[in-house]
Amino acid sequence: MASQVNALLLPVIESTPLHQITKVALTTTLTSKQSDYKFKEIAVPLTKSLQLYEKAQRRQDLRASLKALESIIYQTHFQWNNPLPRHAHLFQKHYHFLLTHWPFENHRDLVDSIAVNNGKLNSTSSRSVWLKADWITLFNVKNPWVQTPPSLMRLSGTDLDTFTPERIFLINSLGNHYKFLIANSHLSYNHKKYPSPGVQIPIRNALGEVSPAKQIAQLFARQLSHIYKSLFIENPPLSPENELALTAVFYDETVERRLRRLYMRACARAYTTTNADSTTEPLMFHCTRWEVD
């Protein structure tokens, strides 16, 4: 199937006004050996964008044509051909640890604490708490609702709750990543505002009861899915390799001003890590700016 689709897509890619660096990245990604699922993840949205581009060209709709090309540029260099940062791989590796230690706020306990706190509601759900707090401290409490699967229990020599150096690196890198995107809201996908990342466990009824444990466990799973999507799919940091590739595009003297501006718009949300090779110090992030005419 992949070879048949590529036979249709590759000539269309070559006919676009995109820079050769983007065309090569697209071609390499499409023709590399991968599962049908991974291929479809790229081929389906790419086909839609190319169809939009061709239709816009026939209608002589310049705005729609440029929008389609912007989408292809962003997806190529930021998503399809962009290696995940180290803490994304660790997120997957230590998923169960995050699931059982992800910070939460139980609304039942919150209500019960009002009397103790002189009628004050001491909530930890505000973004300011997450922006100022030491994230390791926030992760110290293990939640009682997520059960450890038997398959993990049987793993010999594995301490599921230990704050290993790798897990500390992961948590602090996630904290830096979240704080960076909050501080640079212009980078967010569709101008999305990031709420507090803690799990909220609501009161289910007037009696003050909360949901069954299984449903609460699902809240944690959904929140981790949302966090991963926000940090690594919708707003992924640009890899150092891709930053260099795009820099080559911007400083290519043969590129026309209109094409350079197209790339500038497509890459307006670019940011990258300042210490991508670090294995001990948590990752830090900075906005990428290309000073071009």
From Swiss-Prot:
Which terms in the GO cellular component ontology are assigned? mitochondrion
Record keywords, A-Z: Mitochondrion
- Kindly state a single biological-process term from the GO annotations of this entry: mitochondrial genome maintenance
As for subcellular location, the record says:
Mitochondrion
The protein's matches in Pfam families, at most eight in alphabetical order, are given as: GEP5
UniProt keyword Mitochondrion present: yes
What is the first-listed, main subcellular location in coarse terms? mitochondrion
Q: Which family does it belong to?
A: Belongs to the GEP5 family.
Q: Function, please?
A: Essential for respiratory growth and required for maintenance of mtDNA. Required for cell survival in the absence of prohibitins.
Question: What protein name is recorded for this chain?
Answer: Genetic interactor of prohibitin 5, mitochondrial
Q: What is the lineage of its organism?
A: Eukaryota, Fungi, Dikarya, Ascomycota, Saccharomycotina
Q: Which gene encodes it?
A: GEP5
